[in-house]
């Protein structure tokens, strides 16, 4: 199993939110397969944000964006190559806002994770899969744009035979197997880290405002795993208490 996912999910916990039913869909995955983006919980759903599109982009909003990203402290520490070094708020911010990252996928208010369908397993099928393992230290990061940014959608009636770069300093609402994700391009110049939250063993959130609080949280990992049903409840709690951007979309 990939080290990237080791502390995120159980061995059998695999979700697939990128089901490829047509060759055109395969091309769309290929169009973003080499993009550089910070890995997060969305990676376990096989969500690969695209940096190219074969559709015309339509401007739908110009506004400030607030979005969320779930991951674990192990994931960030491992990807930064920190080893046993302490993880700091500055390191977390540098990881997500590395200038090499071309795009950052964000969960927004109308991101519906109930659309996730567990991938069938030859051994068993558990609809209430583990999202964060016992012993892990998951965190919720809240990001906001530094200023108003143009938000686009793809005009699905304007397909071209060629892919073109989506471009920098813009956001694109995209759907991955029914899950709405807001992709922000050139995130290092357009967004900033606003807040970090940890998960208590009662499946509640606590704000981590200092490196001392972050270190204390990392020394008290989850005593029980967070399964899909609990995670969906946490996500709804986040939406009720944090004003995430809402971008209505038509199916």
UniProtKB/Swiss-Prot annotation:
PTMs per UniProt: Undergoes morphogenesis-associated proteolysis which cleaves the 28 kDa to a 25-kDa product. Proteolytic cleavage of major core proteins P4a (OPG136/A10L), P4b (OPG129/A3L), and VP8 (OPG098/L4R), which occurs at a late stage of core formation, is required for production of infectious mature virions (MV).
Main location (coarse class): virion
GO MF terms held by the record: structural molecule activity
Location within or outside the cell: Virion; Host cytoplasm
InterPro entries (alphabetical): VP8_pox_nuc-bd (IPR007586)
Residues the record marks as site: Cleavage: 18-19, 32-33
GO cellular component, one term: viral capsid
Function: Major core structural protein.
Protein name per the record: Core protein VP8
Organism the protein comes from: Vaccinia virus (strain Western Reserve) (VACV)
